[in-house]
Amino acid sequence: MNKGILNVIYQSDDNYAVVSAISIVSLLENNKHLKQINIFYLGHQLKKDSINKLNKMVGNYKNAAITFVDVSSYPDELKEIGVKAWKGLYITWYKMLAFAKLDIKTDRILYINPHTVISGALDGLLELDFEGNVMALSYDATMVNAYKDVIGLKPTDGYFNCGVMLINHKKWMKDKIDAKMREHLRHNRYEVADQDLCNVFFKGKIKKVGVEYNFSTVFYGYDIKKYIKANGFLPESFYSYDEIMESYYTPKIIHSQFGVNGRPWQQGNDNPVGFLWRKYLKLTPWKNAKMPVAKKDINWRLYDLLPQSIIVNLYAWAVNRKFAKTK
């Protein structure tokens, strides 16, 4: 049914249009072999200049097209449901509404967070068997077990990341999931927005995807074995060291979750994958734009000074402390 057609959702406000552009151009560069790539952009207050630049960029690829979706009704819809804004904005929720609103001809749709670089072919996601599940996700590499208890999960339950979401669109529509999800949200509130929703509401209906399709940059920033141990990740609910290393040099999608020494798109960053973002930035209409400057704060200095055995434990302590406040 998919036959080389990839439908993709991106979402951002105007501040992150350039970051989205980096991700989009990396997607297009590494998937020129696909028959068609349809990009649906959910833009919150995108400026005309950004729209023109994105249109021009995507237009350089014969197998790609971009559609800017009218999301003007989304904020009011989300307020009516009663969901909690994320960092003052509702945009993180937009994709959850768009899944039912978009008219696509394939059985699946892929959401990609702008904080990513696509570094390989995504044929595997077009061919993936959902096995009756609603969506396919990868485990989250930054969520500690203590927080699972807050939202009613067990340490042995997987907590999935929503930075890359492969949606079984056929099932979403057939089972009228949009209406069921909205009703659930009217009676439940979540701290980590739609990601908590997916882990709770869709528990048992998520197919685990390999780490290569959502490879967190924490694996490049920290000693992997020490990181797994410090965070108490269990074999039943997280990837093994060997699984992570299998994709270490050949991930399909790299997700920027490590920013201690600057985000990879920021000027002056010392991020282990910053070179990749710079590579693809040069292929966008923003190649000469002045990017935000990375700030060398106390966390960056500690990261440079302290051994990994201490750093990973400090990280785990900080995250546990942060989410303990949500109890």
Where on the chain are the PLM-derived regions?
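Histidine-anchored nucleotide/phosphate-binding helix
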Residues: A17-K32
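Short internal beta-strands
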Residues: I37-Q45, A136-S138
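Active-site-proximal specificity loops/subdomain of glycosyltransferases
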Residues: M57-A100
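GT-A fold catalytic core of metal-dependent nucleotide-sugar glycosyltransferases
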Residues: S72-P75, I91-M143, Y159, L166-I167
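A short, conserved beta-to-alpha structural element at the edge of catalytic cores
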Residues: M135-K154, N269-D270
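Conserved nucleotide-sugar donor-binding
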Residues: V164-K176
